[in-house]
Amino acid sequence: MVELKYGLFDVTAADDSTQSCADVQPFADVSVLNTPDLDSLTVKPWETLETNQWFLDGSKLIFSDEPEKEVFGLWSLSQSGNDCNFAAPITLTCNFTKPHTTVGITLIFREDSNEYANKVKLQYYNSSNELIAEQDYYPDSPMYFCDKLVENYQKIILTFYGTSLPNRYLKLLEVKFGAIKIFDDDSVISAQILEEVDPTGAELSINTLEFTAYTTDFALLDPNGIYAALQQRQAIGAKIDGENFGTFFLDEPESEDDDTTTFKCIDFVGVIDTTDFMGGIYMNKNIGALVSEIMTSAEVEPSEYELDSSIANQIISGYIPICTHREALQQVAFATGSIVDCSRGKAIKIYPASDIVKGTITHDKKMSGHKVKYTTLVTGVEVTSHRYALQSEQSNAYEDTLSVGTYTITFSAPFASLTASGATILSSGANYAVIRVITAGKVTITGFQYEDSTSVVGIYADELPANAKANVISCDSNATLITPLNAQEVAQRLYEFYQNRYEDEGDILLGEEKAGEVWRMNSLNDRDLQGVIQHLDIDMITGVAGVKLTGSAKARES
């Protein structure tokens, strides 16, 4: 079964929201209600002495002796009566520091005991504390969407009048500022996921999800429809038969008619490719600190990336120019031989390539039409090493006539020890300076320029086979984290990879295979190919995936 869960959320509202409620148990914390995007709050199925709440089937847990250490969300002090209503309605207030827009509010109650509020009033207020919208709702399930497009609200008051079952506490787990739209087998027409990795680190691929579905909710020209509230980084969770196939983010929707919409989505690596990293000169920089610097600049939370400790503890030197955050991570990946990937999750994972074989793709999983290619022999690999040193004399990094204002000036080469005339430097780095001009006129920024001295480092075959021609691969000279300290190691690693000359491309019935993993594949003449899966093009409906595996030939294992 295909499930594509689309979070139509105001992606900034959760972090900007502060909740308060007077009618709440002392062990409950309403601040956890505002979970971001498609993240879910994990709450244990506690037993209570409420009417008919404790099922004697082993599904409930004995209530904690230290409930303050557990997660509850909003658990009210008041209990509903025999008529399911509270003696006094319970109010939850959500305050924001800036205006937001939403297509509605999704309320998530206790699914394990199928209980929820029986009536809710939502009131929206603007920045002047004026009521701009209100509506009553009557939930009929533990997850309920309060549908209403509201723009520029800065406070929401939710009033709960009772519970769906008598003599119950109100138990609200999450408040989502938007809608959760689920596309499944009944509505999805087609759905493809592309997963790619480059074991050399020469390219940092963007995984994609593209699907077409029957829906009338996304009329692109309807100013009152759901699309009117869409924002960047809307999350879409992809699952096949309950297994997580990743979290993607809306890139661009398009419609050919009134009933279908095609959603083109990218992974987190694609998201950070839309923003710039200002770079810098690095001398004996801890890679963990460098990656943290890149991620912080990209507004990626620590929980949204994973860096293997074997990489984090390494030291690196060199230079990163102004580039996208994705390109900055690619520089790190190439210099360290790391794989950077988001496959089957949301977080950006940075980890070393592995030679552990995960399993075998047997003939009965392969579709007809596989092509095996024996690539041209690589007899050598050359990389360009960079050494950065400050020039002994100052030079101009920038000179121009500017009017009054604040400017970000970028340089064509890295500089240090910057000074300015005609302006004040507010902040700066090796590649840029933010300046303020108070009086219009000539502005000059001077400093000591870093000079890049390059050399070529190569690894070559000791002997060529008979009739073989030299075939030396020259790697990108713009890999500026390659220095005399690591150039030999990088060239050796690349040379060894290029000795894997077999490529197998074709369709398979997808099982547990993932891009970036090492697998064996039954091939020709009772032999196997063993290597890295570099490419998986997954049809989510049929379970068939186009695969590309690069490796070497091995004897068939019995």
Give, region by region, the residue ranges found by the protein language model.
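Generic structural motif
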Residues: Q19-S20, P26-V32, I156, V188-A191, ...
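An acidic/polar, Gly/Ser/Thr-rich interaction patch typically located in mid-to-C-terminal regions
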Residues: N85-I90, F96-T101, L107-E130, P139, ...
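Local beta-strand/beta-hairpin segments that build beta-sheet-rich folds
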Residues: I132, L172, E243-F245, A397
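Surface-exposed cap/loop segments at beta↔alpha junctions
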Residues: M1-E68, I180-I189, L194, D198-S205, ...
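Aromatic, loop-rich ligand-recognition surfaces of beta-strand-rich domains
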Residues: D65-A133, D140-D185
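Short hydrophobic alpha-helix segments
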Residues: Q135-Y137, F248
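Short, Lys/Arg- and Gly-enriched loop/turn segments at beta-strand edges
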Residues: N167-R168, G242-F249, D526-H535
